[in-house]
Amino acid sequence: TTAWNGEIGKKLIEDGNGFLAYNFRGQDKSKFDDKLNLDTDLIVSDLCLLIEKLKLNNIILVGLSIGGLYATLAVEKGIKSQGLVLINTLRKNNTRLKWINETMVNVARYGGTALLMDMNMPVIASPSFLEKMKSNALNPSNYKGLEKNSGIFKLMEGSLTANWDIDWSKIDVPVLVMTGHHDKVFRISDDIDEISNSMKNVQRLEFSDCGHLIPLEKPIEFAVHLNKFAKNLS
């Protein structure tokens, strides 16, 4: 939530919009029962419950990567959203995706998030963002496996329950699809084209100078596009 509480949030508020950023169960400062499986159903149910308890109206759900899938599943469960913003979310369920996802969990099991980030960054980030990250990366002393019952590991393990065979054509709300071209892991252009073209009401934004983490790489530009999307829906 750090980026949202910084430049992104400030820009949204300047334009008259509000925002709510929250941590999933298992993420920093978010309590959880370590006997629970932090699977897709639980994370989506938490999102729905949060929106209902806070009585949020006139909302746009925004999700990065699998977060976009969770947001879409919340809409499928009946959450009233004016629109969806999917950031490097669209992908097909196949052997390649399952291999990547399971390998990421295994890497985190043995080397923690530090090794996982060092392994992924060159193939998900833009060269300029990679340079910014380099000073705090590539330090083997940071490679410490995650405890089985730690929040982050349980979240990663739970993410393997996600069903990527969702019928995207059933989405009835306007969708903004953001894609970073330096994402060499999840960006399969033909698949994104096919899925996007199946949607009833979709806009697309291509970030040729970004990778997977668009909100971190270009926070102001990202917020400007969110404001524009929200304005067009009002």
Where are these regions (language model features)?
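Conserved HGGG/HGGXW glycine-rich cap/lid loop of the alpha/beta-hydrolase fold
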Residues: T1-F32
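Active-site loop/oxyanion-hole signature of alpha/beta-hydrolase fold enzymes
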Residues: L20-V62, V224
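Flexible "cap/lid" loop of the alpha/beta hydrolase fold
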Residues: T72-E76, K80-G111
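Conserved alpha/beta-hydrolase catalytic His-Asp/Glu region
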Residues: T95-L97, T113-S169
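Short beta-strand/loop motif that positions the catalytic acidic residue
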Residues: I171, V177-T179
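Short alpha-helix in the alpha/beta-hydrolase fold that links the catalytic acid
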Residues: V173, R187-I195
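Acidic catalytic loop of the alpha/beta-hydrolase fold
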Residues: H182-F186
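Catalytic histidine-centered segment of alpha/beta-hydrolase-like enzymes
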Residues: C210-A223
